[in-house]
Amino acid sequence: MCRTLTKVLLKRDFGLEWDMPDSHLVPGLTGRINYLNWINEVLSLLPSQEGKTCNSGSVAITEATTRRTIVNGIDIGTGASCIYPLLGHSLYSWKFMATDIDIESIESARKIVSMNHLEDSIQIVQRTPEQPLLEGVVKEGVDFCMCNPPFFSSAEEVDMNMISER
């Protein structure tokens, strides 16, 4: 039910097509949107192209961010849902480079980006655990970098992850 609700809300509120493998956890939208709004607020406190800052009211914050020419973000560990790049682009027209180490997540994220014709705005990059996080990935200026801790569906999955990292 949560998967269906997320799919319907993304379509209704953001015009996004979305689907992902059943084997992955479904992201809650409210917390993700709040995180992106917080990043937008932080960006608004930085000098704009005109050297001004803005730090009051959500409308002014949005205006401050839109004064920046292009906002580029990196989502480390984007997951199968690619939710932050999708919402960040929909809400603020940000461009994203999204990375992950899981091939199923990469394939799912690429499919979602393609379904929404966002290849010019969201780039999906596969990494390996051995590679440095950002080396060779960042090719132009980056305004922010974001990540979340891994999400697990059960205590057993947490235990398995701990064992595999040793």
Locate the predicted segments by residue:
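S-adenosylmethionine
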Residues: 92-94, 101-166
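Phosphate/ATP-binding catalytic cores across multiple sugar-kinase/actin-like superfamilies
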Residues: 37-42
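Conserved SAM-dependent methyltransferase scaffold
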Residues: 82-85
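N-terminal auxiliary segments of SAM/dcSAM-dependent transferases
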Residues: 1-28
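Charge-biased, low-complexity intrinsically disordered regions
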Residues: 4, 25, 43, 61-63, ...
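N-terminal pre-P-loop "Q-motif" helix
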Residues: 31-35
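Caspase-like (clan CD) cysteine peptidase catalytic core
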Residues: 88
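Conserved class I S-adenosyl-L-methionine
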Residues: 53-80, 95-97
